[in-house]
Swiss-Prot record:
Location in or out of the cell: Mitochondrion
A GO cellular-component term linked to this record: mitochondrion
Segments of this protein annotated with the region Disordered: 145-177
CDD domains: At1g26750
Species annotation: Mus musculus (Mouse)
Ribosomal protein recorded as keyword: yes
Quaternary state and interactors: Component of the mitochondrial ribosome small subunit (28S) which comprises a 12S rRNA and about 30 distinct proteins.
Record-stated family: Belongs to the mitochondrion-specific ribosomal protein mS23 family.
Protein name in the entry: Small ribosomal subunit protein mS23
Gene: Mrps23
Modified residues (N-acetylalanine): 2
One GO term of the biological process aspect: mitochondrial translation
Length: 177
């Protein structure tokens, strides 16, 4: 066994005081007089933590910055994008980072409506040559391409074609080899 568990009984000050009284410690520690002159408001003693059953609730409050909310909306609207991060380039800025910077720049110019500001930021980046594709648009395009390669159009395209909004291309049969 590893010895006694006296560290749980009393504070460091009371144990040191008792060791000096018993003659085990010959010299006072440097901190002893200061501690005696300015004792803490609550004496630091060891207390066993209570057992918690179930999931402990965290008292830590989540930290959200405004640009985190902008990033969350950007990723929800545009997705992560097609361009990978270039970690070898120290000056690399992702599309999302450029979007956040442009958003704050336009916000500092006086725009207050978040929806309008979000759309204007997308337009400003488009003017700079950065093309942003919405997540839903990209999915419907990939569904159309996949369906056309299989030889039939999805239901969404049929509905749009009936309304006259989408031009249907005539399907050509593959030529025999």
């Amino acid at each position: 066994m590893a010895g006694s568990r006296l560290e749980t009984v009393g504070s460091v000050f009371s144990r040191t005081r008792d060791l000096m009284r018993a003659g085990v410690l010959k010299e006072k520690p440097l901190w002893y007089d200061i501690y005696k002159a300015f004792p803490p408001l609550r004496e630091p003693v060891f207390r066993r933590p209570r057992l918690r059953y179930g999931k402990a609730k965290a008292d830590i409050q989540d930290i959200f910055y405004q640009e985190d909310q902008i990033r969350a909306k950007f990723f929800a609207t545009y997705g992560s994008g097609q361009k990978a991060f270039d970690l070898f380039n120290p000056n690399f800025k992702s599309t999302c980072q450029r979007f956040v910077e442009k958003y704050t720049e336009l916000q500092n110019l006086g725009e207050t409506d978040e929806e309008k500001l979000f759309v204007e930021t997308g337009k400003a980046l488009l003017a700079e040559g950065i093309i942003l594709r919405r997540v839903r648009e990209a999915r419907t395009v990939s569904v159309r391409l996949q369906a056309s390669s299989e030889g039939h159009e999805p239901q969404e395209d049929d509905d749009l074609a009936q309304r006259g909004q989408v031009k249907q291309e005539p399907e050509t049969a593959p030529s025999p080899p």
